[in-house]
A protein has these predicted regions:
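Glycine-aromatic micro-motifs
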Residues: 2-159
Length: 159
C-alpha cells in the first residue's frame, strides 16, 4: 500500500487542466485520487492567449474557480515536473510564465481551507497584464473561444 507524503500538496487548477479541458486529459487523467471544486481568494483572472493567468490582488472580491487535484502518490513527483514544464515555471526565474506557490484554497464541499500548489502569473507577465491585460471574471470556463472550441495550451512536446 502506498502512503501519502505530507509534503505532497494538492494542485489548484483553474484553466486548461480543469476536467473536460484538453490538458486535463493529457496530464491528469488516471493520475489523480480526487478532483474537487474549490475557490482561490486574493487573486484576479486575466485572459491570456488561449489560457488564463491568476494574479495576486489583495482585497479581490471574486474568487477564482477551479479544482483541487490530489495526485496519486506514485505519480506525484513526475507530475510535479511535468506541470512545471507545461506552465513554463522555472524556480527563481522572474521571466517564467508562471510561478508555483503555496496558497490556501477553499474546498467547496465543506468550506475547509486546503494548502495547495497554485500556478500564478510570473513577475514579468504580471506586470504586463496589470498594464494592458484583459481581466475576466473568476471562472475561465465561461471564457471559451467564440467558436465554442476549448482554449488549450500545447503541452510539452506538443508545441
Amino acid at each position: 500500500m502506498t502512503t501519502r507524503d505530507p509534503r505532497h500538496l494538492p494542485f489548484f487548477v483553474y484553466g486548461t487542466l480543469r476536467p473536460g479541458q484538453l490538458n486535463h486529459d493529457a496530464f491528469l487523467r488516471g493520475r489523480t485520487e480526487t478532483e474537487e471544486p474549490g475557490h482561490l481568494g486574493g487573486t484576479v483572472l486575466y485572459d491570456g492567449p488561449g489560457y488564463p493567468y491568476a494574479v495576486e490582488e489583495p482585497g479581490a472580491t471574486d474568487p477564482v474557480s477551479g479544482e483541487l487535484v490530489t495526485a496519486r502518490p506514485e505519480a506525484y513527483d513526475r507530475l510535479l515536473l511535468e506541470l512545471d514544464e507545461l506552465e513554463e515555471c522555472v524556480p527563481g526565474d522572474p521571466a517564467s510564465l508562471y510561478v508555483r506557490v503555496e496558497r490556501d484554497v477553499v474546498r467547496l464541499r465543506d468550506g475547509a481551507a486546503v494548502r495547495a500548489w497554485v500556478y500564478l502569473a510570473g513577475p514579468t507577465v504580471t506586470e504586463r497584464l496589470r498594464a494592458d491585460g484583459r481581466r475576466i471574471d473568476g471562472d475561465w470556463l465561461t471564457h471559451r473561444a467564440p467558436d465554442g472550441r476549448r482554449r488549450t495550451r500545447p503541452g510539452p512536446d506538443r508545441r
